[in-house]
Amino acid sequence: MKLNKAFLTLGLAAALLQMPASSFAQTAGGNRQNPLLTKSSLPFGAPDFSKIQESDYLPAIEVAIKEQRANIQKIVNNKKKPNFQNTILAYEESGALLEKVTNIFFGLTSAHKTPGIAETEKKATPLLTELDNEISFNKKLFERIKYVYDNEYKKLKGEDKRLTEVIYKSFVRSGALLSAEKMERMKQINSRISELQQEWGNLLPAATNNAVVWVNSKEELAGLSDADIAQCKKDAESRGGKAPYCIVIINTTQQPILTNLQNRELRKKVYMASIHRADGTNPKFNTFPIVTEIAKLRAEKGKLMGYANYADYSLEKTMAKNSKNVDDFLKQLIKEYAPKADAETKAIEAYAQKTEGKDFKLQPYDRFYYSAKMKKEILNITDDEIKPYFNIDSVQVNGVFYAAHRVYGLNFKQRKDIPTYHPDMKVFEVSDKNGKPIALFYSDYFRRPTKRGGAWMSAFAKQSKQRGQLPIIYNVCNNAKAPEGQPSLITWDEVTTLFHEFGHALHGILSDCKYNTLSGTAVARDFVEMPSQFNESFASIPEIFDHYARHTETGAAMPADLKERMLKSISFQTAYSLGENLAATCLDLAWHKISEDEVPSPYMAGAFEKEELHNIGLLNTQIPPRYSTSYFNHVWGGGYAAGYYSYLWTEVLAVNIADYFAKHGALDPAVGQAFRDKILSRGNTKDQMEMFTDFTGMEKPDASGFLKARGL
């Protein structure tokens, strides 16, 4: 279950009258109001980062926890017969202050984790877990919720009915129907998992930062562009300067920098640093003890809840429903993928042998390098040739925003008057086709040491008509920032990442739901990635592409020949990306389909990974998992346990949606409006398969288009 179910409906004056003394934080000059506990004067109620101090977060969380406890107690002590208003809605509204505070705080724990934020997280996490357990296992509260579900549910309509169902089932899935003994054990499991995930969240970024590869001379970086070399120098300086240059490891197994790095020994060092970052090769950085304990606890949790394993427990609330359906889906993809993967690997090795000799054996750290050379020879194209056309500012404004304008009628105006938590962050006011403001959107695109790897979307405030709250949404990425005065140029993969994350953002921006719990991206895990993956399709539509792909110095459009070669390169050797995702997906499921007794020791965790990949035919040193067990943050630190398959599952949905748009008008505002009305605005107010059918007319997703798009 999630915390933070509610929003204060009291006016500001009433709220201040009730505000306890701890809502005021000490400063050198005396007492000051904690800005996290007062109403923001900024547009949309945006967080005022010019006033918020790191020392404000913990006191605000403590006050908000106290308030939610009091609100829950009011529900429990209510002598009136339980009904939607005094129980379901009261519960929905019980923790809005806590949600407001933690939405802001947890935005920083991922994107700007300073030592102060890390220390606050360490103190706040057990407090929040304790509250979550208190609420999830509050017998009297659940009795009231169950009474409404049993006696009033069938009479309710629309979102009131859906909210009642979602809240009731979330309590059941948290263990509300368990015996007292099992309930107590579930509390212990939840608390321990929370502690372990906090340990993971501190250890993995430290391991990744430690895994940088120091480089003594510019000559060793031969093959890299001047911009990349400058970035290596900048990264070295920001990390203490042990050597003139350093190569920073990103969150995935393979490292994009290997594409151009000529020095084979250095390529090997970078790759080895990546795969061994957290497996205990350096004893200070070993996540396997955390992994195996979490796996044991999850297996026990699934068993306590009456399921064969944790995967089946986790998947019950998804479109897939159970692990067998996911296995069947993956087997179809593996069957189609395996021959193509073998053929691609042989082709790359044969190409490399033309220059390196017939005895040359392709290694995983060679693959990107020789694949890129092969692609250049066949298609006559390199990243360095196309990057000047992908200025990140143009991609955002003239690509991502322009597509949203064409399809959904949205307009974007930068708001430099709204403060942010870091100078790199930008704020935009989003308005509809009639000029009515509907959301704020923040973008934080550049990497820094305080930011975890990857790219994501979240919200400082979710949309809710009940609360009168418009959405405040943000995207975070990890692009390299150019030196001062120079444009930041990105690769095609990074272009699609911007479109992808903004697809998530649109799911939040265009939300039009009554209740916070149901709004925006609060949908099944194997549906939530569909809007983002679908939004990637706009990146290559000619009218959109030509609008943003302009040379950063001349402003000229990308020449037709170069554009054609670039678009062809997108489908060049596609087996790798599918294979690395399949391997990671199957690895995730393997860890969550085993019983407690089958979980290996930390020492044997690496061997378990290899054995499981071998058993399903995916132990391929040439195509390693996108994330290996020891640094698989989605699974051990995020919300994707037994759910990483959803990226492939939703790609099938996204291709079906894109095919519908292509057939009926890819940039037709009427089609965009229908997609907005039937899916993007609906949140979790309706079963997601029904939404999919309502829009496409298809009874179920069809994987044939996905396979074709992957060249299978």
Residue ranges: model-predicted function:
Residues 9-19:
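Bacterial N-terminal signal peptides
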Residues 23-25:
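Boundary at the C-terminal end of the N-terminal hydrophobic targeting segment
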Residues 1-10:
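Bacterial N-terminal signal peptides that target proteins for export
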Residues 163, 195, 202, 207-248, ...:
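Active-site-proximal, well-structured secondary-structure segments within enzyme catalytic domains
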Residues 27-232, 246, 661:
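N-terminal helix-rich structural modules
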Residues 480-499:
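Short pre-active-site segment immediately N-terminal to the catalytic Zn-binding motif
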Residues 41-56, 105-124, 146-188, 248-289, ...:
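Short His/Asp/Glu-rich catalytic/ion-coordination signatures at enzyme active sites or charged loops
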Residues 29-51, 63, 222, 244-246, ...:
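C-terminal, non-catalytic "cap/extension" segments appended to globular domains
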